[in-house]
Amino acid sequence: MPTIQQLVRTGRTQITKKSKSVALDSCPQRRGVCTRVYTTTPKKPNSAMRKVARVRLTNGNEVNAYIPGEGHNLQEHSIVLVRGGRVKDLPGVRYHIVRGALDTSGVAGRTQRRSKYGAKRPKEAKK
């Protein structure tokens, strides 16, 4: 435990919070270009073919970003919007692609949680 004189001399050091999405440079989202679109398998207890894209951001960083939802239209050279948010069972994937923004289409046939997937309101739901 420090003495009062030691605290007067140096003071307490503040614990700084480390960012979990470093490549975004403190921005909420970043634009980028897909350099590779591929599928990969998750960690041990889970089994699937997860859709992932390698994206070069406008600040020069290159990141792996997850493509959420069922089906997508992304290919190489597609312009996408990238937000933070990791995928727990995919190591190295710490970003998500925003559906319904720029070149990324929304999820077709989505009726619930539509705003998360860029889906328009279906016609038959209106009364």
Curated annotation (Swiss-Prot):
GO molecular function, one term: structural constituent of ribosome
Pfam families membership: Ribosom_S12_S23
Protein's GO biological process: translation
Region of interest called Disordered, as start-end residue ranges on this chain: 101-127
Keywords from the UniProt entry: Methylation, Ribonucleoprotein, Ribosomal protein, RNA-binding, rRNA-binding, tRNA-binding
HAMAP family hit by this protein: Ribosomal_uS12_B
Record's subunit section: Part of the 30S ribosomal subunit. Contacts proteins S8 and S17. May interact with IF1 in the 30S initiation complex.
NCBIfam families linked to this entry: rpsL_bact
Entry's family note: Belongs to the universal ribosomal protein uS12 family.
Function field: With S4 and S5 plays an important role in translational accuracy.
Name of the protein in question: Small ribosomal subunit protein uS12
Source lineage: Bacteria, Pseudomonadati, Bacteroidota, Flavobacteriia, Flavobacteriales
